[in-house]
Amino acid sequence: MAKIKLLSIDGNFAKELEVTSDLFVEVPHKQAMFDSVLAENAAERQGTHSTLTKGEVRGGGKKPWRQKHTGKARTGSTRNPHWTGGGVVFGPKPNRNYNLKVNAKVRLLAFKSALTIKLNEGKMLGLVANSDLETPSTKKMVNFINNANLENQKVLLVIADHFSNIKKSTNNLQKVTTKLWYQVSVRDLMHANVVVVAEEAFTNYARKVSK
């Protein structure tokens, strides 16, 4: 069992939470993490890039100069690839799929590895259950960050489904990223300096890995 410090919505220490060791690994698997982040980055590529081939470039239908007796190399079109403004050989075309396949077990191993790294570094905190604000308030979330000594740090706040007011309250906080527990990726965990996980999210994660 791993022990996580839980904070109240005021940013002060509330209690300790014992989290199942099934959420962590003994040794983080760097290759699994690399593959997962690479696949996530690749999936965001639009694949809409396009270049013109020799047959698609406008102009150049006329032979630039006669074949012989000019002292120049022979050429038939200004659309040839070696000409400035000519076509591109084997250039990218639209609708390319950059998606990379990562097995579910590898993705889970990568996620556990990222959680383990944050835990070992002391960069993982918790948020006590039922901590959602009554109404959206950016000021209260700023107080939470300040009281928890998280100023000037990139914070990933992992919340449960019903924490809608906290989500709205952090929209204007530049260094705070708030995501629902099932939206968090390995890249999100590695990019953040500190990860704050709601107590309900820990419960959901534990239920997920136990299946």
Curated annotation (Swiss-Prot):
Pfam families of this UniProt entry? Ribosomal_L4
Q: Tell me the segments the record calls region Disordered.
A: 44-90
Recorded GO cellular component terms are: ribonucleoprotein complex; ribosome
One GO BP annotation here? translation
Mark out the compositionally biased spans (Basic residues): 60-72
Query: A single Gene Ontology molecular function, please?
Result: rRNA binding
For this UniProt record, give its keywords in alphabetical order, as a comma-separated list: Ribonucleoprotein, Ribosomal protein, RNA-binding, rRNA-binding
Q: Which NCBIfam families match?
A: rplD_bact
The record's PANTHER family line, in alphabetical order, gives: 50S RIBOSOMAL PROTEIN L4, LARGE RIBOSOMAL SUBUNIT PROTEIN UL4M
Kindly state the subunit structure of this protein.
Part of the 50S ribosomal subunit.
- Family (UniProt): Belongs to the universal ribosomal protein uL4 family.
Describe the task this protein carries out: One of the primary rRNA binding proteins, this protein initially binds near the 5'-end of the 23S rRNA. It is important during the early stages of 50S assembly. It makes multiple contacts with different domains of the 23S rRNA in the assembled 50S subunit and ribosome.
Tell me which HAMAP family the record gives. Answer: Ribosomal_uL4_B (MF_01328_B)
Q: What is this protein called?
A: Large ribosomal subunit protein uL4
Recorded source organism is: Ureaplasma urealyticum serovar 10 (strain ATCC 33699 / Western)
